[in-house]
Amino acid sequence: MAKKTPLYEEHVALGAKLVDFAGWMMPLQYESIVSEVEAVRKNVAVFDVSHMGEILISGADTAMFLDWLLTNSFSALNVGQAVYSVMCNEKGGIIDDLIAYRIADNEALLVVNAANTQKDFDWIKLQSKEFNVQVDDLSDEYGLIAVQGPKSESLLSSVVQEVSSLKYYHFAEFTIFNKKMHGE
């Protein structure tokens, strides 16, 4: 049976056409794909991407491990920065692309593609054996939304004023509706 995101009931109430995507019941469309594409290009759209995988890496060797595991430098990031990167196998073939967030000096959150979450987790866990890190799959503990389109900042700023001060590939923690959120 497919998993349901924290927003599943909202999708149903709003009349979404739901499909199984990577083991998750996800909205394919609401009224029409054309109007939704128009919204993203000219206005703003909110996407439920809670099906994405979230893998926490923690421990003294976090930065060293991720520098070894990913194609981009993780150790160059300050807390509050993120990097889009690729995770490769021993022959240089791509396992997955992901975003790595430096949430503390010795802590990182990797957001991986939904269809690859278990495969990625297993690979990361296997590769971590020589490093002083802990690897945890937190995918079932996170809800994730993406806000996209030219009016995204305007919409988000109406709820969280600090959003406008974020730089490219930076994030911060905010409280929205009494819930702690991370904004990128």
Feature roles, as predicted:
Residues 1-184:
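Basic, glycine/lysine-rich polyanion-binding surfaces/domains
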